[in-house]
Structure formats: C-alpha cells, structure tokens
C-alpha cells in the first residue's frame, strides 16, 4: 500500500514537473486570435448571472471600477417584470457593443437557488429585486450591513425602472448616460477600446470554458472510440504542457494519470454510459479546468445573439494560444494534434471537414512555432472569409460582430504593407502580424489572470499550489521547450506500467477479501 502511494505521488510529480517546465515563460509566448464580449440585444442577457461558486472570484477579477448586483428570485413575478428594465441598463455597460464599456459591471444573483442562500444573507437581502452598488472588489471581499455607516457598498433604493436606475447611476457618477446611447455610428466600426490590452484578460475565462465544454461534449456525445482514443491522449498532452490556464494544465494531467480507468482501449460509450462517465470524472474531482467550469456563459466570446460566437470562438482562442506557447521542435506534433482533435471530436460536420481539408493541404512539416502560428492565423482568416459570405447570403451572422479580416488596419497598421487591397487580398507584413499577436495576446492574458481570478479560486488549494510552485522552481532550467512534451510523453509510459501494476493489486485484494 505504501509503495503504491509513493509510486502514485512520484508519477504525479513527474507529470506536473513536465507541465511546469513546458509552461515556463518564453519571449514569444501566449498569443491568440479572437474577439471581445458583446451582449447586444436586451433579450441576449447583457447582465452576467453569478452564483456562490464564482461570485467572489468573478468580481475580484472585474476590470470595471463599479458594479451593480441585482439579487432576485426566479419565481418572483416582480423580478421577471423588472428583468427587461435591468437588461436595458446592462446593455449600456456590459460587453463590446456597449455604449459605455469598462465602467460598470452589471450582474445578477438568483437567491431562490439553494447554493446562493448564504451569499444573499451575506448582503442582507430582504426583498426582491434588491440592488446594490459598489466597487467590484468590495463585493468580493465583504458583506453588506444596512446599519453600517460609511459602507462603500450602497443600496440602490430608486431603480424600479430602467430610466430611474440609470438616473440613480448618473447621480452617483455625476454623468449623463442615456438609454438611447449607442456604441457605433456604423455597426462595422471598430470599438474604441478594442486595442485596450486590459480587455484581453477576459479571454482566459473563455479558453477555460471552451476546454471544459469540449471534454463535456466528448463524454456526452460518445464521440470517443478506440480508433480516436490516441488522438485525445496526444491533445491532452499538449494541454498539460501548453494550456495558458494553470488549472487546466493540472486538470489535464490528472485526467491523463487516470486515463485508463475512464477510457479503456476497447471503450465504446452508449449515451447512458457517457453520462455515468461524466459523473464519475466529476466525482473523482477530475474537472479539467476546475469544478466551477464550465460556467455556462462567455465573456470575451459572447455574441449579441445566443447562437453566435461562444464555443467556436473559445476553441479558436484555445488553439491560437497553444500554437504560440510551444517550442520550435513541437510545431509539427502540435499541428498534427490540433488537426486530429478537430477531425475526431468537433461535431459541426461541415466545419470539421473544411478545417481538416486545410490541414491536409499542408505539404511540408512545420519547423518553427512562428510558422505554425501564422498558418493558424491565415487559416482562421480563410474560415472567416468563407463564413462572411455565407452569413451575408443567409442573414445568419452576428450583426454586432461581423466576420472581418484580422487584424484590422485600425489595430495593426504595420501589419499591412499597403493600405490598398486588391481583389480582397491583403499584402501582409507577416513579421508585424506575428509581433502583433505576441503583443496583443501576450503575457497580459496570463499575468493579469494569475493576479486576480486564479488567486481567488485557488485559496483553498494553497498547499497544492505551493507544492506545484516548488516543482516549477526546481524544474526551471535552460532546456529547450520541446523537452517539456518529451518528459510528459515518457511519463505516460511509466503511468501505463504503474496503473497495470495497480490493477493487478486491486484484483489480488478482491481475491483476498
């Protein structure tokens, strides 16, 4: 028993060491391609729904200086009638298409949900709807007591209509916002804050969301078969080494350690078996990006309609973030892993086939991370151009987030060798494009995340984080980045031997009993 425990500990240390080594900062790391959140129309729920599991972390991570939180009950008729009023105001401040983005976070909490009872009591909620105003960090770190003087969190006592709520906010901020304010004079204009590097931090939440949803789809839709099992292993290995989220790297490592237990080589799942497997993965705390993910909503990738952007946007951001975090020696294997993953597990048939055709058209192996990053960027633009035409003909696109050639000239003038575009073809300066991706989706995406959201969510894991940090420090040596994946790959050979031995021990114990 003691030997088995030691062996398991050693294996986990090896996997985490590989992930820590491979995830060590590189000068050309962490960039992606994507778009910012934009809730859009009133019925698109501009306000962000929060609950007790993510309330503190989300508000602590908020970049806005102010927040309004509505506490309501879903069964309350007055709350249902009030929702359109609250959404009208939320539409002004939340998201890329907002008239006044980056000023106020508009959120909601359902106090009728059992998980939120203590949270609502913490803020002395005694009627519905109940609105509070204050700095997001104060919501995250304190409670509200109506008897307490000089409280930075204030009760909004006159916000029963959209007009009255906005008037209260205007009085508080000494502003003159109007419900008629619009973000764009032209719907194709680039948002004023699109080049703000502070906005990119929210992309990391959607990378986690896309990662968790991808695994959920694999389990629920029984897409894993014996023939594509290895491609999932290879993709998880990339996530262990290169995922921009530390929690997702750790979760991927845990899944790989227990891979044979959950997905045997002859596994073929029925729908019921897939649901049971999803439950078993959750019960054993193998949530790939944390137990509160998927959260069920998008930030950076939120569209103005419920059916636009979202998962596909998040998946693109994930793939781009992987390609720019690898070492040169990993470029070809990463390319193969991404292509195989989309081919085997992306369930949009037309998109899957089209992407794999572009993968198959590559004639020479990739030699550098730069080559792979630019190929994926070019591929993404080709997909956008194809979808732009289809969505225009069918009227199915997102009116506030039309497909565009990326990056637009407003964001990266140096990316264009000439301001003239001939027959839709752009004369790109690829060196500038790559540098743009490095700068726009670089260290800010990960560093801001670590300083805010991650710190809050991982308070309960201080011991684990401390051990992981020690491993990372011990493993930080000037070795080529490819060694990270090499170590991870070798580790899984040891894992297989270890788990086979453990399974034999389990059978013996059963016989003994």
Swiss-Prot record:
<feature type="domain" description="Thioredoxin">
    <location>
        <begin position="31"/>
        <end position="174"/>
    </location>
</feature>
<keyword id="KW-0676">Redox-active center</keyword>
<keyword id="KW-0560">Oxidoreductase</keyword>
<dbReference type="GO" id="GO:0006457">
    <property type="term" value="P:protein folding"/>
</dbReference>
<keyword id="KW-1015">Disulfide bond</keyword>
<dbReference type="GO" id="GO:0005615">
    <property type="term" value="C:extracellular space"/>
</dbReference>
<dbReference type="InterPro" id="IPR039798">
    <property type="entry name" value="Sulfhydryl_oxidase"/>
</dbReference>
<feature type="signal peptide">
    <location>
        <begin position="1"/>
        <end position="30"/>
    </location>
</feature>
<dbReference type="GO" id="GO:0016971">
    <property type="term" value="F:flavin-dependent sulfhydryl oxidase activity"/>
</dbReference>
<feature type="binding site">
    <location>
        <begin position="377"/>
        <end position="384"/>
    </location>
    <ligand>
        <name>FAD</name>
    </ligand>
</feature>
<feature type="binding site">
    <location>
        <position position="316"/>
    </location>
    <ligand>
        <name>FAD</name>
    </ligand>
</feature>
<keyword id="KW-0274">FAD</keyword>
<feature type="binding site">
    <location>
        <position position="320"/>
    </location>
    <ligand>
        <name>FAD</name>
    </ligand>
</feature>
<protein>
    <recommendedName>
        <fullName>Sulfhydryl oxidase 1</fullName>
        <ecNumber>1.8.3.2</ecNumber>
    </recommendedName>
</protein>
<feature type="disulfide bond">
    <location>
        <begin position="348"/>
        <end position="351"/>
    </location>
</feature>
<dbReference type="Pfam" id="PF00085">
    <property type="entry name" value="Thioredoxin"/>
</dbReference>
<feature type="binding site">
    <location>
        <position position="350"/>
    </location>
    <ligand>
        <name>FAD</name>
    </ligand>
</feature>
<feature type="disulfide bond" description="Redox-active">
    <location>
        <begin position="76"/>
        <end position="79"/>
    </location>
</feature>
<feature type="disulfide bond">
    <location>
        <begin position="301"/>
        <end position="313"/>
    </location>
</feature>
<feature type="binding site">
    <location>
        <position position="403"/>
    </location>
    <ligand>
        <name>FAD</name>
    </ligand>
</feature>
<feature type="binding site">
    <location>
        <position position="354"/>
    </location>
    <ligand>
        <name>FAD</name>
    </ligand>
</feature>
<feature type="active site" description="Nucleophile">
    <location>
        <position position="79"/>
    </location>
</feature>
<comment type="function">
    <text>Catalyzes the oxidation of sulfhydryl groups in peptide and protein thiols to disulfides with the reduction of oxygen to hydrogen peroxide. May contribute to disulfide bond formation in a variety of secreted proteins.</text>
</comment>
<dbReference type="InterPro" id="IPR036249">
    <property type="entry name" value="Thioredoxin-like_sf"/>
</dbReference>
<dbReference type="InterPro" id="IPR036774">
    <property type="entry name" value="ERV/ALR_sulphydryl_oxid_sf"/>
</dbReference>
<dbReference type="InterPro" id="IPR017905">
    <property type="entry name" value="ERV/ALR_sulphydryl_oxidase"/>
</dbReference>
<keyword id="KW-0964">Secreted</keyword>
<dbReference type="InterPro" id="IPR013766">
    <property type="entry name" value="Thioredoxin_domain"/>
</dbReference>
<dbReference type="GO" id="GO:0000139">
    <property type="term" value="C:Golgi membrane"/>
</dbReference>
<dbReference type="InterPro" id="IPR017937">
    <property type="entry name" value="Thioredoxin_CS"/>
</dbReference>
<feature type="binding site">
    <location>
        <position position="309"/>
    </location>
    <ligand>
        <name>FAD</name>
    </ligand>
</feature>
<dbReference type="GO" id="GO:0003756">
    <property type="term" value="F:protein disulfide isomerase activity"/>
</dbReference>
<feature type="glycosylation site" description="N-linked (GlcNAc...) asparagine">
    <location>
        <position position="51"/>
    </location>
</feature>
<feature type="domain" description="ERV/ALR sulfhydryl oxidase">
    <location>
        <begin position="304"/>
        <end position="406"/>
    </location>
</feature>
<feature type="disulfide bond">
    <location>
        <begin position="412"/>
        <end position="415"/>
    </location>
</feature>
<feature type="glycosylation site" description="N-linked (GlcNAc...) asparagine">
    <location>
        <position position="266"/>
    </location>
</feature>
<dbReference type="Pfam" id="PF04777">
    <property type="entry name" value="Evr1_Alr"/>
</dbReference>
<keyword id="KW-0325">Glycoprotein</keyword>
<feature type="binding site">
    <location>
        <position position="406"/>
    </location>
    <ligand>
        <name>FAD</name>
    </ligand>
</feature>
<feature type="active site" description="Nucleophile">
    <location>
        <position position="76"/>
    </location>
</feature>
<feature type="glycosylation site" description="N-linked (GlcNAc...) asparagine">
    <location>
        <position position="193"/>
    </location>
</feature>
<keyword id="KW-0732">Signal</keyword>
């Amino acid at each position: 028993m003691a030997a088995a425990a030691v062996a398991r500990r050693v294996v986990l240390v090896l996997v985490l060491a590989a992930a820590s080594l491979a995830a060590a900062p590189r000068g050309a790391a962490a960039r992606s391609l994507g778009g910012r959140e934009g809730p859009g129309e009133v019925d698109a729920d501009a306000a962000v729904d929060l609950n007790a599991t993510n309330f503190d972390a989300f508000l602590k991570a908020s970049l806005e200086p102010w927040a309004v939180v509505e506490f309501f009950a879903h069964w309350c008729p007055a709350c249902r009638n009030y929702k359109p009023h609250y959404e009208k105001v939320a539409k002004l401040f939340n998201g890329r298409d907002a008239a006044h983005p980056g000023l106020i976070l508009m959120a909601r909490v359902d106090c009728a949900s059992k998980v939120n009872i203590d949270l609502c009591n913490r803020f002395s909620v005694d009627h519905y709807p109940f609105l509070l105003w204050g700095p997001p960090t104060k919501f995250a770190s304190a409670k509200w007591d109506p008897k307490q003087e000089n409280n930075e969190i204030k009760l909004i006592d006159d916000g029963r209509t959209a007009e009255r709520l906005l008037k209260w906010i205007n009085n508080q901020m000494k502003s003159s916002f109007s419900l008629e304010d619009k973000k764009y004079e032209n719907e194709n204009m680039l948002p004023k804050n699109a080049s703000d590097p502070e906005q990119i931090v929210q992309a990391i939440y959607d990378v986690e969301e896309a990662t968790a949803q991808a695994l959920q789809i694999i389990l629920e839709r029984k897409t894993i078969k014996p023939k594509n099992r290895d491609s999932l292993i290879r993709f998880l290995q990339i996530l262990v080494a290169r995922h921009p989220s530390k929690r997702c790297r750790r979760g991927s490592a845990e899944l790989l350690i227990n891979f044979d237990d959950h997905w045997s080589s002859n596994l073929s799942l029925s729908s019921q078996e897939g649901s049971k497997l999803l439950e078993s993965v959750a019960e054993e705390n193998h949530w790939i990006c944390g137990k509160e993910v998927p959260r069920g909503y998008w930030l950076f990738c939120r569209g103005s309609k419920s059916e636009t952007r979202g998962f596909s946007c998040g998946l693109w951001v994930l793939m781009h973030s992987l390609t720019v975090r690898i070492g040169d020696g990993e470029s070809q294997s990463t390319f193969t892993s991404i292509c195989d993953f989309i081919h085997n597990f992306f369930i949009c048939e037309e998109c899957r086939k089209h992407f794999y055709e572009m993968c198959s058209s590559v004639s020479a192996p990739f030699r550098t991370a730069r080559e792979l990053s630019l190929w994926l960027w070019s591929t993404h633009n080709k997909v956008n151009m194809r979808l732009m035409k289809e969505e225009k003909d069918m009227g199915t696109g997102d009116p506030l987030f039309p497909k565009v050639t990326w990056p637009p000239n407003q964001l990266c003038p140096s990316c264009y060798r000439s301001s003239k575009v001939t027959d839709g073809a752009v004369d790109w300066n690829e060196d500038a494009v790559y540098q743009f991706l490095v700068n726009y989706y670089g260290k800010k995406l990960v560093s801001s995340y670590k300083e805010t959201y991650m710190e809050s969510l991982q308070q309960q894991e201080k011991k684990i984080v401390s051990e992981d940090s020690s491993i990372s420090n011990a493993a930080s040596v000037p070795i080529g980045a490819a060694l990270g994946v090499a170590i991870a790959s070798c580790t899984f050979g040891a894992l297989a031997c270890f788990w086979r031995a453990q399974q034999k021990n389990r059978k013996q114990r059963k016989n003994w009993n």
